[in-house]
Amino acid sequence: YTTLFRSGTTVVVDAGHGGEDGGTLSCTGVRESGLNLEIALRVNDLFALLGQRTRMLRTQDVSLHDTDAATIAARKASDIRARVRLTEETPKAVLLSIHQNHFPELKYRGAQVFYAAADGSRALAERLQTALGTQLDPDNHRSCKKAGEIYLLKHVSCPAVLVECGFLSNPAEEALLRTPEYQKKLAAVLCCGMLEFLEEPYESC
């Protein structure tokens, strides 16, 4: 068993997308990148209040690409590599990446957590997924999943999860995700789940 001690850990808070990369569009035309940032800022503020060290990868609606990236594709690739590098250079990091889901069929809803192959990632994802179901949305019976080709999770070596906070294609869930009240509750669930994980031993995968 390995233990992560809260006092020595930095939670890397990643608001997915940003700048010209808006991510997906909601059913009312809201950009995913903006919602990701709103939720990530709430998560970061709550961690600060609780005394947990954090590092936010972006605090504004910007991309993290290199200035010499000339095309949209090059800028997107450069941006995601920068997120990997910033996470990897953070001592004792645990990565929490915030995203939103989208699907052509409007009926799908519910937050879901994806986890990296790195030790501790699955344990963190299971804790967060359970908390999202029991404390945020009792109708959410989704299970966490191992990330497939998610570049960020595939290339970091620390415990890492990506949280799809909900489906922007579902009108009811999209409306909730835009409200400060729901964002605050979501942030509280994620923060508490993360801190519980940091204070307990986990079995190496």
Question: Predicted segments — roles?
Answer:
Residues 5-123:
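Catalytic-core regions of hydrolytic enzymes
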Residues 1-3:
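Single conserved hydrophobic/aromatic residue that forms the stacking wall/gate
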Residues 97, 104, 141-205:
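Active-site-adjacent mobile loop/cap segments within catalytic or ligand-binding domains
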Residues 120-146:
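Active-site-adjacent substrate-binding region
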Residues 37-44, 81-84, 122-129, 150, ...:
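Extracytoplasmic/secreted envelope proteins and their assembly/folding machinery
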Residues 51, 110, 140-141, 157:
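A generic structural signal for alpha->beta connector loops
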Residues 41-52, 88-92, 100, 129-137, ...:
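Sec-exported extracytoplasmic/periplasmic mature domains
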